[in-house]
């Protein structure tokens, strides 16, 4: 099997090599036909090359390296742990690409556009090193527009080696963890694929949530309310004391149903509240919104966003639509602010302009640590390409994402929405019921960003000290366990914990899925038994690697390298000092996969044990010595030293799978109800209502 994969990989490399070779030769012929261009720009992707060449015309030749061209060796460690000298090699299959680039750039001025993150700077550094290019040859831009590109080529700069060093440190740390832990994993857990530095911390977060859900014991409580003038007023006080919904017992519920026949309105509070516009998108918030509103996986969002940034073929030519999509800054350039202001004034009026254009752009993200770079937010490159116009230029999914970005950006530059909030307190003996409702009096940014249903006006007829006939209602409910992570909520958690960076979120999730440590069911991320076993091993042998605090601290140190405050080699050596202790212990101490389970043996009624053998995880009965394969569709939780199998309680139809097309978050809500531990009771709700339909009547 491994040999087959190698052969397939070699064939793929050969095809990629031939494809790139043909492309570069074509570019060379094109150069000759134009009389030979003196300046060459090398970008990563053919799409970006096409867009930039259309902008710059005949003065520049723009060619593509088709991605990375140099990295640490695939089949060797490539790092001298004493000197930290790195043994880079041309990526297999890219040799002829490099040779062609060398020929085409010989004797010419070379410019290297760098994506505005560490990885982009490192790619430019690799290219400049291979080509022997020195001096000011780096150009940067956040959007592929005529203004931005022409401005960039006028102002080249030198390579930022602090950025490069931060990326080298990240690459070396990842290589150390992957190269040194993975063989130990393979020795103990045959099914395990590998262990990554940041992915392992993310796996632990997912496993901890599943364990938390397993340990959760539902608590029964009652919701008690009255319907009055289009409002739903809930019981909030008993004998003058605030009461939480979870503290409302069946006894209280029955007492309310029996005794409350009418209520008196004791207070109305009316106040004006402002709802501020959202900040423009950064990578993480775009991923979260695209998941919850469009149902896009993170990887799909980033793929489409990259294409919108680099440019897509339209009937009007190869056109870029958005700014750079890997960013953790909400900053908006002065040019973009001015364009948005003109658009808003023309289409909506002065009252829709943000009181301060800085408000939204100063919000930023809640990421622990620093924003990686003071770059721009994700926004449309031309606000005049409205979603309506873009619909004629883009396919369905590209248009959906563009519309999301366009609306978010325009909304961020608009004024606040203004609401009038009404709060009502109703009293009946020792019981107080509270209700509130908001009425929008000015839509502001919500004119483009959201559509709210108009509330009922009946509540305005209510008067203080008036008494109203009511028929209270009650419904039994249960507290629910914390939701499983979706891709969107995991990205939010990783961002808030300071784990990873915008460019890595999609890779982290995809790697866990590809390795079989996590599966996606109804848009929720569920750790597999293999994922739990791998996490258990890493927790026991390499606790720092899976510790989110430690991982976040490493990100801060990489930030300090980028800021020139720390030497990258010292950061790596400091990591190695502690890591080597765990590594030696893991090498020398015996570790066995031997978990008790709650799975019953069909032959002797004893309980199986979970073990690992030549072909991976299996079940073994210690009493009758029988073995049983562990099916891949079995899910469980390892808590302590025992595996508890989870059972599927609800059918797909009950989860609303029949005819609905759901977003990630709405799908996740049903998916989060799907697996429960064996001894947990069903979460069905019982209703107890005094009347199926009741209307508030003025007494």
Curated annotation (Swiss-Prot):
Alphabetized GO MF terms: DNA binding; DNA topoisomerase type I (single strand cut, ATP-independent) activity; zinc ion binding
Residue ranges occupied by any Topo IA-type catalytic domain in the UniProt entry: 160-583
Residues annotated as domain Toprim: 38-146
Keyword DNA-binding: yes
Active site: 324
Residues at which Mg(2+) binds: 44, 115
Catalytic activity annotation: ATP-independent breakage of single-stranded DNA, followed by passage and rejoining
Biased composition (Basic residues): 674-683
InterPro entries on file: Topo_IA (IPR000380), Topo_IA_2 (IPR003601), Topo_IA_AS (IPR023406), Topo_IA_cen (IPR013497), Topo_IA_cen_sub1 (IPR013824), Topo_IA_cen_sub2 (IPR013825), Topo_IA_cen_sub3 (IPR013826), Topo_IA_core_domain (IPR023405)
Cofactors (names): Mg(2+)
Subunit structure: Monomer.
Protein name, as recorded: DNA topoisomerase 1
Record organism: Fervidobacterium islandicum
Gene behind this protein: topA
């Amino acid at each position: 099997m491994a040999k087959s994969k190698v052969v397939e990989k070699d064939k793929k490399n050969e095809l990629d090599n031939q494809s790139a070779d043909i492309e570069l030769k074509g570019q060379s012929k094109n150069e000759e036909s134009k009389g030979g261009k003196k300046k060459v720009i090398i970008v990563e992707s053919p799409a970006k090359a096409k867009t930039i060449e259309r902008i710059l015309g005949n003065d520049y030749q723009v060619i593509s390296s088709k991605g990375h061209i140099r990295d640490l060796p695939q089949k060797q460690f490539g790092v001298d742990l004493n000197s930290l000298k790195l043994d880079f090699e041309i990526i297999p299959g890219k040799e002829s690409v490099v040779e062609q680039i060398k020929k085409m750039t010989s004797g010419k001025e070379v410019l290297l556009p760098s994506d505005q993150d560490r990885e982009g700077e490192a790619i430019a550094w690799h290219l400049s090193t291979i080509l022997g290019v020195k001096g000011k040859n780096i150009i940067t831009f956040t959007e592929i527009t005529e203004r931005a590109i022409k401005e960039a080529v006028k102002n080249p700069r030198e390579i930022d080696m602090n950025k490069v060093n931060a990326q080298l440190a990240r690459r070396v740390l990842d290589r150390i963890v992957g190269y040194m832990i993975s063989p130990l994993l393979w020795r103990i857990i045959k099914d395990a694929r590998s262990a990554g530095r940041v992915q392992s911390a993310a796996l632990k977060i997912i496993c901890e949530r599943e364990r938390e859900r397993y340990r959760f014991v539902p608590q029964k409580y009652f919701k008690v309310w009255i319907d009055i003038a289009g409002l739903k007023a809930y019981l909030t006080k008993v004998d003058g004391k605030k009461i939480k919904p979870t503290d409302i017992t069946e006894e209280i519920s029955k007492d309310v149903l029996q005794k409350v026949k009418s209520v008196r309105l004791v207070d109305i509070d009316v106040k004006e509240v402002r709802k501020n516009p959202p900040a423009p998108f950064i990578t993480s918030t775009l991923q979260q919104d695209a998941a919850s509103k469009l149902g896009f996986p993170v990887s799909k969002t980033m793929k489409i966003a990259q294409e919108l940034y680099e440019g897509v073929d339209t009937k009007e030519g190869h056109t870029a639509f958005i700014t750079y999509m890997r960013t953790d800054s909400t900053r908006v350039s002065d040019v973009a602010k001015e364009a948005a202001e003109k658009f808003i004034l023309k289409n909506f009026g002065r009252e829709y302009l943000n009181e301060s254009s800085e408000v939204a752009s100063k919000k930023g993200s809640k990421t622990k640590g620093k924003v990686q770079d003071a770059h721009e937010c994700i926004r449309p490159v031309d606000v005049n390409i409205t979603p309506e116009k873009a619909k004629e230029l883009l396919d369905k999914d590209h248009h959906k994402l563009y519309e999301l970005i366009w609306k978010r950006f325009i909304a961020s530059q608009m004024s606040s929405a203004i609401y009038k909030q009404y709060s009502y307190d109703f009293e009946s003996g020792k019981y107080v019921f509270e209700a509130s409702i908001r009425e929008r009096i000015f839509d502001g940014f919500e004119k483009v960003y959201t559509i709210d249903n108009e509330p009922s006006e009946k509540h305005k007829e209510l008067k203080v000290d008036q008494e109203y006939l009511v028929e209270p209602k009650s419904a039994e409910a249960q507290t629910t366990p914390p939701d499983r992570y979706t891709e969107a909520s995991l990205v939010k958690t990783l961002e808030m914990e300071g784990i990873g960076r915008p460019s890595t979120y999609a890779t982290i999730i995809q790697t866990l899925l590809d390795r079989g440590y996590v599966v996606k069911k109804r848009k929720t991320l569920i750790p597999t038994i293999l994922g739990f076993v791998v996490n258990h091993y890493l927790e026991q042998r390499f606790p720092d690697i899976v510790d989110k605090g430690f991982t976040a601290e490493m990100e801060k140190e990489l930030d300090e390298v980028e800021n020139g405050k720390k030497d990258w080699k010292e950061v790596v050596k400091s990591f190695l000092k502690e890591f080597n202790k765990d590594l030696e212990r893991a090498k020398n101490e015996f570790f066995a996969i031997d978990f008790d389970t709650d799975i019953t043996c069909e032959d002797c009624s004893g309980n199986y044990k979970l073990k690992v053998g030549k072909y991976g995880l299996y079940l073994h009965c210690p009493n009758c010595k029988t073995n049983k394969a562990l099916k891949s569709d079995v899910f469980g939780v390892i808590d302590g030293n025992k595996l508890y199998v989870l059972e599927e309680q609800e059918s797909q139809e009950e989860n609303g799978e029949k005819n609905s097309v759901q977003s990630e978050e709405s799908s996740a809500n049903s998916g989060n109800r799907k697996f429960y531990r064996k001894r947990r009771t069903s979460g069905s709700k019982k209703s107890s209502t005094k009347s199926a339909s009741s209307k508030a009547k003025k007494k």
